[in-house]
Curated annotation (Swiss-Prot):
InterPro entries per the UniProt record, alphabetical: A-crystallin/Hsp20_dom, HSP20-like_chaperone, HspG1-11-like
Protein's name according to its UniProt entry: Small heat shock protein hspG10
Domain of life: Eukaryota
Keyword S-adenosyl-L-methionine: no
CDD domains: ACD_sHsps-like (cd06464)
Keyword terms: Stress response
Family label: Belongs to the small heat shock protein (HSP20) family.
Coiled coil: none
Domain sHSP: 31-74
Length: 74
């Protein structure tokens, strides 16, 4: 499965959205990761990666964040 870094790197380097979608595996609802990926701002500093995204209509209490095997899940 592609990581968020792979997705961003592919999308930024060759700007080929379809190629990026093909790299992502599908989930149980047959949507690829990119189909459910909200727009986000990604900033990298020397010691951290900052990801900002809007999750309209979702309460802060209902947001879960998990990192496992280099995969960030929000």
């Amino acid at each position: 499965m592609a990581t968020i870094f792979d997705i961003l790197n592919t999308h930024n380097n060759n700007n080929n959205f379809e190629n990026c979608k093909r790299q992502c595996s599908t989930n149980k609802s047959n949507k690829t990761i990119i189909d459910i990926l909200p727009s986000m701002d990604v900033t990298m500093t020397n010691d951290k990666l900052i990801i900002e995204t809007e999750l309209a209509g979702i309460s802060k209490d209902h947001i879960e964040i998990d990192i496992k095997d280099s995969i960030l899940t929000i």
